[in-house]
Amino acid sequence: MQSFIVEQLQGEVVDVYCGGPDVFSGKVESCAGNVLTLAQDGKYTYIAIDKIIALWRAQYP
């Protein structure tokens, strides 16, 4: 998953689903050490790659 994110989604705005009611959104800033870093509105979200169920390019960045 990490190599796919780096090669295909680096710099893209994505939505990330990890289960439950929450979907995380933001621009893919980095993906290293099995952690995905998203940036949105000057704040960062760090997501453990092994917790990701699905991710997709956001329709409305």
Regions found by a protein language model. Give the residues of each.
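Conserved RNA-binding domains used in RNP assembly and mRNA/RNA metabolism
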Residues: 1-61
